[in-house]
Amino acid sequence: GWRDWLKKAGGWLKKKGPGILKAALGAATQ
């Protein structure tokens, strides 16, 4: 169900979130 997906997404964001934010900020400032 979507709750399982949310749990997976939450765990993934905890691991990958900082890097994604840095990449997004880098792209936005270019």
UniProtKB/Swiss-Prot annotation:
Keywords: Antimicrobial, Secreted. May have antimicrobial properties, like most ant linear peptides. This is U1-poneritoxin-Ni3c. It is found in: Secreted. Its main location: secreted. It comes from the Eukaryota. GO terms for cellular component: extracellular region. Belongs to the ponericin-G family. Expressed by the venom gland. Pfam families: Ponericin. InterPro entries: Poneritoxin.
